[in-house]
Curated annotation (Swiss-Prot):
Disruption phenotype: Deficient mice are viable, do not exhibit cardiac defects or embryonic lethality, and are generally normal and fertile. Deficient mice have decreased levels of sphingosine 1-phosphate (S1P) and dihydro-S1P in blood, accompanied by increases in very long chain ceramide species, and have defective lymphocyte trafficking. S1P levels are increased in lymph from deficient mice as well as in specific tissues, including lymph nodes, and interstitial fluid. Moreover, these mice have aberrant lymphatic sinus that appeared collapsed, with reduced numbers of lymphocytes. Lipid transporter that specifically mediates export of sphingosine-1-phosphate (sphing-4-enine 1-phosphate, S1P) and sphinganine-1-phosphate in the lymph, thereby playing a role in lymphocyte trafficking. S1P is a bioactive signaling molecule that regulates many physiological processes important for the development and for the immune system. Regulates levels of S1P and the S1P gradient that exists between the high circulating concentrations of S1P and low tissue levels that control lymphocyte trafficking. This is Sphingosine-1-phosphate transporter SPNS2. One of its GO terms (biological process) is B cell homeostasis. GO terms for molecular function: sphingolipid transporter activity; transmembrane transporter activity. Belongs to the major facilitator superfamily. Spinster (TC 2.A.1.49) family. Pfam families: MFS_1. It is a multi-pass membrane protein. The chain crosses the membrane at residues 141-161, 169-189, 202-222, 229-249, 261-281, 320-340, 364-384, 398-418, 422-442, 466-486, 507-527. PROSITE patterns: MFS. InterPro entries: MFS, MFS_dom, MFS_spinster-like, MFS_trans_sf. Its main location: membrane. The gene is Spns2. It catalyses: sphing-4-enine 1-phosphate(in) = sphing-4-enine 1-phosphate(out); sphinganine 1-phosphate(in) = sphinganine 1-phosphate(out).
Amino acid sequence: MMCLECASAAAGGAEEEEADAERRRRRRGAQPGAGGSACCGARGVGGAGVVSADEEVQTLSGSVRRVPSGLPSIPSTPGCAAAAKGPSAPQPKPASLGRGRGAAAAILSLGNVLNYLDRYTVAGVLLDIQQHFGVKDRGAGLLQSVFICSFMVAAPIFGYLGDRFNRKVILSCGIFFWSAVTFSSSFIPQQYFWLLVLSRGLVGIGEASYSTIAPTIIGDLFTKNTRTLMLSVFYFAIPLGSGLGYITGSSVKQAAGDWHWALRVSPVLGMITGTLILILVPATKRGHADQLGGQLKARTSWLRDMKALIRNRSYVFSSLATSAVSFATGALGMWIPLYLHRAQVVQKTAETCNSPPCGAKDSLIFGAITCFTGFLGVVTGAGATRWCRLRTQRADPLVCAVGMLGSAIFICLIFVAAKTSIVGAYICIFVGETLLFSNWAITADILMYVVIPTRRATAVALQSFTSHLLGDAGSPYLIGFISDLIRQSTKDSPLWEFLSLGYALMLCPFVVVLGGMFFLATALFFLSDRAKAEQQVNQLVMPPASVKV
């Protein structure tokens, strides 16, 4: 059967050449190769039946083996050469992917850092924005909520495009777009707060392209523990970029004496990163790391993809758990620096800011803690998952559940400690964020396990939409709204500014506990859904010999 396949693939009269070569070999007393196949030019020599690898010459059209004198050289196609080497011979990876995978992952991670740096630069100068535009907590929370709303609406669109068109071009265009909008927003006059809100919405559209598509490229470059490691690096960019956003916003504001300059740093870096993605990130094939040498069949329709994802219980529960994480991180990231500033005003260790520029110490400290806990959390989560995989195949969702439930305890303690000790509050923030950030990369790895390659961009997009819709799209505004609502029924004082925001933020740990429950539900269905995905991948793969060129 192998001879028939190879003969049909060879060009011009391969069957006749095969018959002539066989007759000549029999006259010389030669035996067929050790692979048991007498085709494809894989001829035994002197009865040994082995041809060394250095006797094969690669050409643009295929490969040709050098044959000792007296034996004719028979050209072979790449598929035939692979068959001659035997079933145990590894398939060579494309050179473009083999050399540039690490660099591509690093550039994509850098782009993710910039996305979150830009997103949380606004939070780093939030008090200045409130004083400059004259808005209360509700208006300040609207900036983040509008950003997330546009982000989640655009995410499914980019997920559809990412499964069907050139992904790195979409990434670069998204970065160029949000960089231009962010830079322009730094020139908005004081009386046009609505323009700043609109600009944040447009930035959300640009950043949606990146967060939706970039993880799927990494998923197509690596597999198994290596993919977990690379996704850990990529998702470490979330807390790192968030922390750098606070630090950049407050530091640039202090250096320039004007908070507007904080919005002019990330656009320059974004333009550079977008260019690097266009030049250095390889155009990987979807499912390259999973298809084991075959080629994926034609992809399914968008409607069929959506139906399959909705029926995937591990995907649904992990998406709901991710929504709880987004709710907490969105609310805490937006309001904790301001909450700690108000705590110090109550403790009379700081003064109320009535005009910008305001103090930046809390944003700097919180940013530094976020950067370090992000690194520690991602590394701890990935390491704990690898260790637990040796003991249970449900390690991924179980580690996430433990991290979420432990984080909820320390988030509660933040509001208890802040009343008397800012240092104690920072310690609780450190532990709580470390546990909360431990599930970023693991959640992405769960998605890669239970979703087939041709649906991953759509799956990431739908998960982003769901997590933002139920999470940080409304949590910053909701916390600000509750805070203002409580203050309306009390006297206007620094104490009630502090207490009202703290009471509103107490909603976060309860949502985090709910997320931990969703991860436990994911663990119930993880193994069966992963097995289904592996079976579907095998059905989608066409063996190389059957692929028409």
